[in-house]
């Protein structure tokens, strides 16, 4: 089967973006042909010369050795001055038709909310259905939508909030109607979508989002904690202001005997590097290689995310897969995976440093509690790899 997986941009750190590349890898592991279909952008910056796409005849170019790590088709796109700051595809319903015909796509999977890719894909699907109903010989290409719909909108300005509410009101119902299958992370997200009168049989609930490469690394890579410290706490993800990564500097100042490891990339990376130069216990990691991240995770007594908004929370699952308890921000979907007080904790607010430190102190003083939490986390996340999700999608759209 040939599958196109559509996402706003590629990333090694942003869960809602890297999930698309993870799914491409998963389909390919199962023997299918799959491509990431995305914008010009990787981590917010152009991944190739924009002129290559602008001057292409069909509005897209294929990049075999793409920075995303998977075969990638990059399409006409821009970063308009929209309130949401989202990437926008240009003329995508036409381009998607060209891609589908050129690559013989048997399925199109579209990820994420609050951007125009899902709406354009839904319009393309609606046109094909209309043509088929009129008697045209149209290739059946199911549309799978993975909304990553998290109702706790992160809005720094009223206009941003209004834009997301309008998208939910005007665009989401149309997309849900046109999709052949909806994939959601958990029963809570399914309940949100049923408010739009989505038939239950159209919804596939799955938390299988762990990168198979990361899972293999976690299974085989030994822990390698920085020397000279009693224990390690860590964060892996985007380094931006809304992720509250400045709090790790504060934590490093408070935990003199612990290593505070921060792995990621983003606008706050340079500042964190400078802070790490004057604090031996603040360790910055810029590599996204699975073995490196696996070592960070397995060396940690606990993982944490202080984000103001995290709509997917896959990193939490990776920590749990390794048997590492996780502290989830209330504005992170990780709070839907972590059972409070069982395999991690729910922070009362996104900047709850003292609450997190009190919990870590307890884990260090009572290793039997930490080990029990770790066992429960590992049991919950066991087998939640993306290849199982890919197989479930293929089974549902083939039936």
What are these model-derived regions, one by one?
Residues 132-133, 138, 142, 152-174, ...:
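Nucleotide-sugar donor phosphate/pyrophosphate-binding loop at the beta->alpha transition
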Residues 225-243, 249-253:
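Conserved donor-binding/catalytic core segment of Leloir-type glycosyltransferases
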Residues 188, 209:
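Carbohydrate-associated surface elements
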Residues 302, 325-329:
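Short hydrophobic beta-strand element within catalytic cores of glycosyltransferases
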Residues 308:
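Aromatic "clamp/platform" in nucleotide-sugar-dependent glycosyltransferases that forms part
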Residues 88-92, 108-136, 145-153:
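An aromatic- and histidine-rich active-site surface loop
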């Amino acid at each position: 089967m040939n599958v196109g997986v559509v996402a706003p941009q590629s990333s090694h750190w942003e869960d809602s973006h890297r999930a698309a590349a993870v799914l491409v890898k998963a389909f390919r592991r199962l023997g299918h042909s799959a491509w990431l279909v995305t914008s010009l952008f990787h981590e917010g910056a152009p991944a190739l010369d924009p002129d290559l796409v602008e001057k292409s005849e069909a509005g897209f170019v294929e990049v075999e050795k793409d920075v995303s790590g998977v075969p990638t088709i990059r399409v006409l796109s821009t970063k308009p001055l929209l309130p949401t700051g989202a990437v926008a595809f240009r003329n995508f319903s036409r381009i998607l038709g060209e891609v589908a015909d050129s690559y013989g796509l048997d399925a199109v999977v579209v990820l994420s909310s609050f951007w125009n890719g899902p709406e354009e894909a839904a319009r393309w699907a609606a046109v094909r259905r209309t043509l088929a109903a009129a008697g045209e010989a149209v290739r059946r290409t199911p549309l799978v939508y993975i909304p990553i719909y998290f109702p706790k909108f992160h809005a720094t300005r009223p206009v941003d909030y209004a834009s997301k509410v309008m998208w939910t009101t005007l665009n989401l119902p149309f997309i849900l109607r046109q999709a052949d299958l909806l994939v959601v992370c958990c029963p809570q997200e399914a309940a949100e979508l049923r408010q739009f009168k989505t038939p239950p049989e159209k919804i596939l609930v799955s938390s299988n989002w762990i990168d198979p490469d990361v899972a293999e690394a976690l299974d085989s890579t030994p822990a390698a904690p920085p020397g000279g410290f009693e224990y390690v706490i860590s964060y892996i993800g985007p380094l931006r202001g809304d992720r509250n990564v400045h709090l790790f500097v504060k934590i490093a100042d408070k935990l003199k005997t612990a290593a505070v490891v921060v792995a990621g990339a983003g606008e706050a990376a340079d500042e964190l590097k400078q802070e790490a130069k004057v604090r031996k216990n603040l360790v910055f990691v810029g590599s996204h290689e699975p073995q490196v991240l696996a070592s960070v995770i397995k060396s940690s007594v606990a993982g944490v995310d202080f984000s103001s908004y995290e709509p997917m929370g896959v990193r939490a699952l990776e920590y749990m897969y390794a048997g590492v308890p996780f502290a989830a921000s209330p504005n992170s979907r990780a709070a839907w995976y972590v059972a409070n007080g069982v395999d991690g904790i729910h922070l009362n607010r996104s900047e709850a440093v003292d609450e997190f430190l009190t919990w870590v102190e307890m884990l260090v003083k009572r290793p039997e509690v930490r080990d029990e939490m770790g066992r429960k986390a590992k049991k919950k996340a066991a087998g939640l790899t993306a290849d199982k999700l890919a197989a479930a999608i293929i089974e549902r759209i083939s039936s």
